[in-house]
Amino acid sequence: MLLAWVHTFLLSNMLLAEAYGSGGCFWDNGHLYREDQPSPAPGLRCLNWLAAQGSRESLTEPSPGNHNYCRNPDQDPRGPWCYISSETGVPEKRPCEDVSCPETTSQAPPPSSAMELEEKSGAPGDKEAQVFPPANALPARSEAAEVQPVIGISQLVRMNSKEKKDLGTLGYVLGITMMVIILAIGAGIIVGYTYKRGKDLKEQHEKKACEREMQRITLPLSAFTNPTCETVDENTIIVHSNQTPADVQEGSTLLTGQAGTPGA
């Protein structure tokens, strides 16, 4: 799986390099240079790569192709260069000046080794020779390897998240069980709160009724007496002090006149 991602990454970088090449620029050591500059400096002219390498009889350096533009086949840290004709007529290596491409991009530069593997010699009559990347191209390859795991991990995480969506029967059962437990806990909390609230209200009502009963029992006596309205018992017997008159006996009556004198 990781190897497939590496191939995809390299292919995208190659396509990106071709896109920039078609626009007149190419990547080299993290920089963007102009592709069609045939002069290393004012007044100088680059020699054809095949002609210059053929005259030098050097097979260790890879050939950039059948053209005379500034390139960097040996990964020179100074940047692109080309061969020029010296005073003695021997091809001489000369770094190119002012070859920076005015276009900018935020994409990472493609590995130079992948570009070099795609380039082949275009000289007529010559056999096609396999071009091997130089030894100093390893840092660029290591930089690409450092970037690859990051992209691969993010893609793997997305794939794993998609695969984990299907929880299976056990997952659904556990999910439903957890939902039932949560709902039961919530219902228990609501019922408990309602029961406690009703019990508190009932106790308050009973307490108020008890207080009213105690107030009725412990009222002062003045609340039951009214001085303006006194009642008398109807069965009370009234005893008077009048004496019963005695019987009058004959001969005992006093002879008194109207004037009250005896014998009158």
Swiss-Prot record:
Disulfide links within the chain: C25-C101, C46-C82, C70-C96
Region named Disordered: 94-129
Gene3D superfamilies cross-referenced by the UniProt entry: Plasminogen Kringle 4
Keyword Transmembrane listed: yes
Cytoplasmic compartment segments: 192-264
InterPro entries per the UniProt record, alphabetical: Kringle, Kringle-like, Kringle_CS, Kringle_sf
Extracellular face residues: 22-170
Amino acid composition bias (Basic and acidic residues), ranges on this chain: 117-129
Protein name: Phosphoinositide-3-kinase-interacting protein 1
